[in-house]
Amino acid sequence: MPRHAFRNGKHLNAVPETGGEETGFLMEKNDMLARALGNLPFRRNVRAREFTTFRIGGPVTFFAEPKDADELCAMLSAARSCDYPVYIIGNGSNLLVSDSGVEALFIRIGARMAGVGFDGTRLKCGAGALLCTAAKAAVAEGLAGLEWAAGIPGTVGGAVAMNAGAYGGEIKQVLKSVTVVECGRIAKKIVHAGDLGYRSSV
């Protein structure tokens, strides 16, 4: 049986069950990634039920939670150097992982990158902040525009990536700029509403 992970009804990955020679190859790739990650924080063979809201799913070979953008860059560079598959996730909502597991590095942008603060009349959030937390913080500060997000269980990063929306509101209506990791570099980008479409972003 193939190993699968799904998000929004789409395959995240499909890795066939392997025999002796291929299993040895995968083990070698796993060891290569472990060495490349070095002192970066990661765990091996973590069950997906630990990080999905459905609390189901088999083991993923590597699981990591960066504390900041620099650590995220380092993790992505390590995986790229080994040609190892990577999936970046947030709160684990809308995510199903097969009980068979997935051979990949799962990077969760979570509580370690979940800061919420203000810069004048602008709300600044880490990608790991819960969207509902950001919405409540905005209301408490008297800022309008994010009320529709109060009941959404995902993270700010996930909401930006898919241009989340509900009740007539969308992230693109309030998003002004983002800090992204792009080709191993950290960059800030100004965002225009036209850059985001229905459940999609650039």
PLM features: residue spans?
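FAD-binding subdomain of flavoenzyme oxidoreductases
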Residues: 147-149, 158-202
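N-terminal low-complexity, intrinsically disordered patches enriched in charged
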Residues: 18, 99-101, 137, 163-167
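Anion-binding (especially nucleotide phosphate/pyrophosphate-binding) glycine-rich loop
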Residues: 28-156
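Residue-identity detector for glycine
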Residues: 9, 19-20, 24
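Basic/polar N-terminal segments that are highly enriched at the extreme N-terminus
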Residues: 12, 26-28
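Short non-domain terminal segments
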Residues: 4, 23-24, 40, 52, ...
